[in-house]
Amino acid sequence: SKLVIAAGCWAGRLLKDIGIRIPLAPLHGYHTDIADSGVSLSRPVLYASGGFVNTPVESGLRIAGTVEIAPLDAKPNFRRAEILVKKAKRNLFPGMKRTDGSQWIGARPFMPDTLPVIGPAPGVENVWLAVGHGQLGITMGPTTGKLVNAMITGRLPVVDLTPYRADRSYV
């Protein structure tokens, strides 16, 4: 049997248990979802100079941006999210009715060289890694799955995966 580890930010803990260490770190992104904000968007709006994105969601408006590298169990600093909401009201949506909302963080698995780890686990037979995609995990997941499937089934992947090896240099 074969095992694929694709566990996001928690992959580091699983890998440590089988003797593999890679410099995987959580990259926390801050979000605020505001219901009844008075802002109606039909599509996401990037405020590049402010460093955040405004997205229409079922519950209303999501304002997201700012990231920090911190341990998984670090206490969130929601002041970061509050600053984004204030910027959105001041610079984009002066008519925003409400600025309070549901705050949360999303942890994304981040590698110091920004490349994911895709391929066999070094020194452990029948274990394959698909981790460290950062903010692009959901976007890159299907392609990564196809690449890992090709390797597991003995086929040549359509991409040279040398840069994505777990035993590469990260400096």
Regions found by a protein language model. Give the residues of each.
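Active-site substrate-recognition segment that forms the wall
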Residues: 1-125
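C-terminal lid/capping helical subdomain adjacent to the catalytic/cofactor pocket in oxidative enzymes
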Residues: 121-171
